[in-house]
Amino acid sequence: MPEVQPSALPKPAPRLGRDAAVASICGFVVALMVGASFAAVPFYDWFCRTTGFNGTTQVAGSAPSSEPLARKVSVRFDSNINGLPWKFEPEQREVEVAIGQVVTVYYSVTNTSKRATTGQAAYNVTPLTVGSYFTKINCFCFTEQTLAAGETREMPVVFYVDPAFAADNENDTVKNITLSYTFYPVREPPPKPLASGEPDQRKGNL
């Protein structure tokens, strides 16, 4: 049997090169996963708004072109606070509306603390299948709300239930709809500029 010369054997790849390649691949995969996670947030929000998935309501700039239908449903209003020193409640707990009828209701919110605070409302509709038909024309939930210490504000919600709701067989037994809001804190307001010569209370004694 002929003897294999050492020079004929395959040489192992340099370990340093292999480690660098593996590290590069791992870094690329991690970056891809992080990027995908950030992209998923706006995509999920867009998907919910477009389809009404998870009870997300729709947005319209005007009333429906068709006349309201004879069929009516009861719309209940729910309010919640998470992490804010606010009192938040609907001025009406329930209204009966015709399908396609534009309705305006009000929520009242009061900042019970001694400082300005900012919040924004998240919302959904139940049953979840109604989300794609529950349409808002105007809502305080579209923007952040900043309340001064002790301030009370009345905030309107203008909405209608799309007439297509009645054509969907899944809604044949739906008689009650609940619109729910939860206010969450957004950020601390920036400190007010001090007048000339006014001591800065945020600093300790020097």
From Swiss-Prot:
Pfam family, one: CtaG_Cox11
Subcellular location: Cell inner membrane
Topology relative to the membrane: Single-pass type II membrane protein
Keywords: Cell inner membrane, Cell membrane, Copper, Membrane, Signal-anchor, Transmembrane, Transmembrane helix
Positions of transmembrane segments: 18-40
Signal peptide span: none
GO cellular component, one term: plasma membrane
Superkingdom assignment: Bacteria
Ranges per topology, Cytoplasmic: 1-17
GO molecular-function terms, A-Z: copper ion binding
Periplasmic side: 41-206
Main localization of the protein described in the UniProt heading: membrane
GO biological process: respiratory chain complex IV assembly
InterPro entries: CtaG/Cox11_dom_sf, Cyt_c_oxidase_assmbl_CtaG
Purpose: Exerts its effect at some terminal stage of cytochrome c oxidase synthesis, probably by being involved in the insertion of the copper B into subunit I.
Family statement drawn from the similarity comment of this UniProt entry: Belongs to the COX11/CtaG family.
PANTHER family: CYTOCHROME C OXIDASE ASSEMBLY PROTEIN COX11, MITOCHONDRIAL-RELATED, CYTOCHROME C OXIDASE ASSEMBLY PROTEIN COX11-RELATED
Protein name per UniProt: Cytochrome c oxidase assembly protein CtaG
Protein species of origin: Rhodopseudomonas palustris (strain BisB5)
Annotated gene: ctaG
